UniProtKB/Swiss-Prot annotation:
Pathways involved: Mycotoxin biosynthesis
Residues with attached carbohydrate: 86, 317
UniProt subcellular location: Membrane
InterPro entries linked to this entry: Cyt_P450, Cyt_P450_CS, Cyt_P450_E_grp-IV, Cyt_P450_sf
Cited PANTHER family: CYTOCHROME P450, CYTOCHROME P450 MONOOXYGENASE AUSG-RELATED
GO molecular function, one term: monooxygenase activity
Domain of life of the native organism: Eukaryota
SUPFAM superfamilies xrefs: Cytochrome P450
GO cellular component: membrane
Name of the molecule in the record: Cytochrome P450 monooxygenase bsc2
Biological role: Cytochrome P450 monooxygenase; part of the gene cluster that mediates the biosynthesis of the diterpene glucoside brassicicene C. In the first step of the brassicicene C biosynthesis, the bifunctional diterpene synthase bsc8 that possesses both prenyl transferase and terpene cyclase activity, converts isopentenyl diphosphate and dimethylallyl diphosphate into geranylgeranyl diphosphate (GGDP) that is further converted into fusicocca-2,10(14)-diene, the first precursor for brassicicene C.
Length: 525
């Protein structure tokens, strides 16, 4: 009897101890969450979609599904700066009128603005890790090597485009139904990889799958982690679907790319030992080796970083352009006429030839104007407190987004809500405006590639690649909406991004082009 009482007392004490421990842990977790919870910035109106009772989780959900609507609400209701929450922190939103004032300011950091949003120190996020570790390296590869080699790589891109079109759209003269977004993504991934990794890997099915999926899973993985308590993220990453996929893709990318990097290094070292110049290269994997100059570089992470930056935004522009051709078939003929005239009167696919395709350039830019991939012109972290010209104080360590909100402004564009494929071609005809309205040009009124010191360094490559693909699509194929599909040419929102519904089907058929694009490409190469 006495023994039973002792056991009962021990059980009661254990339960009391366990209860006390659990309460303490929960109280500590609640305290940590409260203390670490981001606070709104003083002096900036907080814009929400659900009112003042919104929680962090509802902030995150609204940002994920309706981020652009949230920001547009603030822009329409307020004339100056305001703030929003994406669930993991607050951002000050600034209209584009502040863009020129901030675009090159030394105390405004792009890298620090995005670092905590993208978890570069977590496994699998290798592309972000290399980009944030040494942003100057990637920029040097793009600005110094890729941009200055556009004349060299244009023919390679045109040639690869013929292979990619054949592989994805085929040669059928009959109308066929296609998931056009997926086809365009495949084509962009292959051409981009031709410049990034060379001829062999750009057709490797496993690599193409990695490069297409890595960016999507990077952003999804970041979103998954942002919705977790900071204390739990190091553990929760191993249970998140997108994070798990990222680790698999990163490992596979290393298996494919590392041997190529080592082979390039050996060839360069052997040439130097023999007193010769290293072999000439025409892809970023070789240019990375040249630019590294003894620096510790994660070459695979660098390639994944380029994939994040290059593929999905270009796919979006081209997808929306094809949709516009289906909506406005009357603009197809003048575009085809220009492309044919230029290719017949020049030496085929070349940088000067692409420059002369001004209607095509204008068409793609007008697509961007009315259907931009994102409406954010700049992300920055304020490294030192700063007072704007109108007296607005940006606190130290605050994060800001400057909007690209002039794209439909009637003070900038005549009849701004109407699609005019030749709008920018006509603007370039004005004295002194020749170089101001090209697809790759940036300004505070048109910042789809960003603006200022941190504008997209690869925009000149992107513009040339977009024109090559679009020109080949126009000359080689006809497009139209499948009956009942026009209404599916809608956009799907994701944070500040809007993309075409990937389930959209379009009718495609091979046509007899005005000149043999394949022959022109081969003769130019």
């Amino acid at each position: 009897m006495e023994s039973a009482q002792i056991h009962s007392t021990r059980d009661s004490l254990f339960i009391l101890w366990l209860t006390t421990l659990l309460v303490s842990v929960l109280a500590t977790a609640a305290y940590i969450k409260f203390q670490s919870r981001p606070r709104p910035y003083s002096g900036f109106p907080l814009v929400t979609l659900g009112g003042p009772s919104e929680t962090d989780s509802s902030h995150a959900a609204n940002w994920f599904r309706r981020g652009r609507a949230l920001v547009n609400k603030g822009l329409s209701e307020l004339s100056g700066a305001f703030q929003i929450s994406n669930g993991s922190g607050y951002w000050i939103i600034l209209p584009s009128k502040y863009m020129d004032e901030l675009r090159n300011h030394p105390d405004m950091s792009l890298r620090d603005a995005l670092r905590e949003e993208n978890f570069p120190n977590y496994r699998g996020f290798d592309g972000f890790r290399q980009a944030f570790k040494d942003s100057t390296f990637t920029q040097e590869v793009i600005r110094v090597k890729v941009t200055q080699s556009l004349g060299l790589i244009t023919a390679n891109l045109a040639n690869e485009c013929q292979h990619a079109l054949q592989e994805n759209l085929g040669e059928s003269r009959e109308w066929q139904q296609r998931f056009i977004i997926e086809d365009i993504l495949n084509i962009v991934a292959q051409l981009t990889s031709r410049v990034f990794l060379g001829e062999r890997l750009c057709r490797d099915k496993e690599w193409l799958q990695i490069t297409k999926e890595y960016a999507r899973n990077s952003f999804m993985g970041s979103e998954e982690l942002r919705q977790c308590l900071p204390l739990t993220r190091p553990l929760m990453q191993f249970f998140m679907p997108a994070c798990t996929q990222l680790r698999k893709f990163s490992a596979a990318a290393r298996r494919l790319i590392d041997p190529e990097v080592q082979a390039r290094k050996r060839r360069a070292e052997e040439a130097i030992k023999l007193g010769k110049k290293p072999p000439k290269v025409e892809d970023t994997i070789g240019w990375m080796v040249e630019v590294a100059r003894g620096r510790q570089v994660d070459y695979v992470g660098g390639q994944l970083a380029l994939s994040i930056a290059a593929i999905h935004s270009s796919t979006d522009n081209l997808s929306k352009a094809v949709v516009k051709l289906c909506e406005m078939p009357e603009i197809v003929a003048p575009l085809r006429e220009e492309i044919t005239t230029v290719l017949e009167s020049t030496d085929g696919w070349s940088k000067p030839a692409l420059y002369r395709m001004k209607l095509l350039d204008s068409f793609l830019k007008e697509v961007q104007r009315l259907a931009p991939f994102t409406i954010v012109g700049m992300h920055r972290r304020v490294m030192k407190g700063y007072v704007l010209s109108d007296g607005t104080h940006l606190p130290k360590n605050s994060r800001i987004m400057v909007m690209n909100d002039k794209l439909r402004d009637s003070s900038v564009y005549e009849d701004p809500d109407t699609f005019k494929y030749d709008r920018f071609a006509r603007l370039r005809e004005q004295p002194g405006q020749e170089d101001q309205h090209q697809l790759a040009s940036t300004s505070s009124e048109f910042a789809t590639f960003g603006h200022g010191e941190h504008a997209c360094p690869g925009r000149f490559f992107a513009a040339n690649q977009l024109k090559i693909i679009m020109a080949c699509l126009l000359l080689k194929y006809d497009f139209c909406f499948q009956p009942g599909q026009a209404e599916k040419a809608r956009v799907i929102p994701f944070e500040m991004v809007e993309t075409i519904d990937p389930t959209l089907k379009i009718e495609v058929r091979r046509r007899s082009e005005e000149l043999d694009v394949t022959k022109v490409a081969k003769e130019t190469a």
